[in-house]
Amino acid sequence: METLTFQFPAAEPGRGRTLVGCVSSGDLEVLMEPGTAGSLNIQVVTSVNGSGARWEQLFQRLFQGRTWPAVNIDIHDFGATPGVVRLRLEQGFEEIAHD
């Protein structure tokens, strides 16, 4: 198991909390809750050791060049593909936009 942390610039805190996915379905669970203004924080707990560069590239592509709400994101991963990660994050942001 490996724990990775990432931080990106963000706007105002998001509204509400959400949980999307589950580790046994798609191998990924994403929890989101409001964060501190100006900061999007991500913690990934993954069963895939040595995958930090892959996660960093995925987040760079997703979070750069666009303004996101300030949230804290906890990701529990059991070998999900980048496509599943992106899908779950997009679902999470969609959910908090409706709270």
UniProtKB/Swiss-Prot annotation:
GO cellular component entries: cytoplasm
Localization in the cell? Cytoplasm
Identify one Pfam family in the record: ACP
User: Describe its PTM?
Assistant: Covalently binds the prosthetic group of malonate decarboxylase.
Which coarse location class applies to the principal site listed for this UniProt protein? cytoplasm
Has keyword Transport? Answer: no
Record keywords: Cytoplasm, Phosphoprotein
- Single GO MF descriptor: acyl carrier activity
At what positions is O-(phosphoribosyl dephospho-coenzyme A)serine found? 25
Please describe what this protein does: Subunit of malonate decarboxylase, it is an acyl carrier protein to which acetyl and malonyl thioester residues are bound via a 2'-(5''-phosphoribosyl)-3'-dephospho-CoA prosthetic group and turn over during the catalytic mechanism.
Q: This protein is called what?
A: Malonate decarboxylase acyl carrier protein
